[in-house]
Amino acid sequence: MYKDIDSHQRDSRTDGHQDGFKKNPNFRFFKKKTCKFCDMDRVPDYKEFDFLKKFITEQGKILPRRITGTSAKHQRRLALEIKKARYMALLPFVKK
């Protein structure tokens, strides 16, 4: 009823996805970033605008979590505090 397939045929893939990271020379393992706020036991505050500048791009955009490494909870709080600092003119909306 069932064909007898040896284990080598069953495990190999024809589309080239098996062990793709070993074959791709550009593949790199990235060190997982840790949240700076969790490590230092602090919360983002709009009054610390020098520290908040680290989380803003040159154009004035808020950096995403995948780049900064902040946790979801602290990223939401960080965005609110940056917006408060912008509203109070401690941080610019747009950098030139």
From Swiss-Prot:
Keyword RNA-binding: yes
InterPro entries registered for this protein in UniProt: Ribosomal_bS18, Ribosomal_bS18_CS, Ribosomal_bS18_sf
Gene3D superfamilies xrefs: Ribosomal protein S18
Biological process annotations from GO: translation
GO-annotated cellular components: cytosolic small ribosomal subunit
Region listing for Disordered, in residue ranges: 1-25
Disulfide-linked positions: none
Keywords from the UniProt entry: Ribonucleoprotein, Ribosomal protein, RNA-binding, rRNA-binding
Biased composition (Basic and acidic residues): 1-22
GO molecular function, one term: structural constituent of ribosome
Pfam families (alphabetical): Ribosomal_S18
Superkingdom to which the source organism belongs: Bacteria
Quaternary organization: Part of the 30S ribosomal subunit. Forms a tight heterodimer with protein bS6.
Known role: Binds as a heterodimer with protein bS6 to the central domain of the 16S rRNA, where it helps stabilize the platform of the 30S subunit.
Alphabetical list of PANTHER family matching this protein: 30S RIBOSOMAL PROTEIN S18, SMALL RIBOSOMAL SUBUNIT PROTEIN BS18M
Family: Belongs to the bacterial ribosomal protein bS18 family.
Name the record gives this protein: Small ribosomal subunit protein bS18
Organism annotation: Borrelia duttonii (strain Ly)
